[in-house]
Amino acid sequence: VPPEGYWDRVQEICRKHDILLHIDEVVCGVGRTGTWFGYQHWGVKPDFVTMAKGVASGYAAIACTVTTEAVFEMFKDDAADPMGYFRDISTFGGCASGPAAALENMRIIEDEALLDNTSRMGARLVANLEALAERHRVIG
């Protein structure tokens, strides 16, 4: 867990120097921290987010990058074909099983309230780790 104010400062520096803020959610994304994405715990507004395994819970190959409209506009190089730049940059492009698995995975996460369960289990884990740290000075 980053120190308090860390992400605010990172975001401030990026905005000040016109640097795009990329958040890699391959490990923390898609419900693994009690929110859809780990960065949501700190109110960060990234310019683009990458995610992979968790999108389909490992049942199908899928990875994706999600971005803002402003970043998307930067990549357009042909007004007649606004998707031209993005057409051939996908490892799993054209494979429908990944997106199908992702949609079903997200439906299950919502239907079974797994974000809430993750939050409860996370709080339980933290409480138990804190109890261990109190008993063993080498922890922490």
Residue ranges of predicted features:
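Conserved N-terminal phosphate-binding loop of PLP-dependent enzymes in the Aspartate aminotransferase
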Residues: V1-G140
